């Protein structure tokens, strides 16, 4: 994943895809269904192509990808986006001009599916409605972002010291 979009991922655990590491994992596992990567990172397109060839869904996540990156990823086999809208940019400026971010680029890939955290906090209902209008029910999944402390109450202790729980919502401090 892209370290600049780590979100709740522990920065010290982030690294670029390395075939010397992921190939043995894939070859010795029978349960991998999906694996996330940021397509703009070194080795990510090769990783996505390998996963797709092995029947594992490569998914875009924690990314700063722009259109050229998303298009290259789609062509390499990435056909899904994890936690759409979260840990990825939308429109942004370079100087005085607007540029598409990951979000708009994904909307331009008609056959790319997305998953949206449907808690009304990660993504507001109005944006979920917009996503539904653009992607449709066939290409949009509603998911949770539940952690190990889900439904445990505000006094629960999270596994990561950066995580706090307030009013039933788990978030980074």
Which residues does each predicted region cover?
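Active-site-adjacent C-terminal substructures of enzyme catalytic domains
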Residues: 69-173
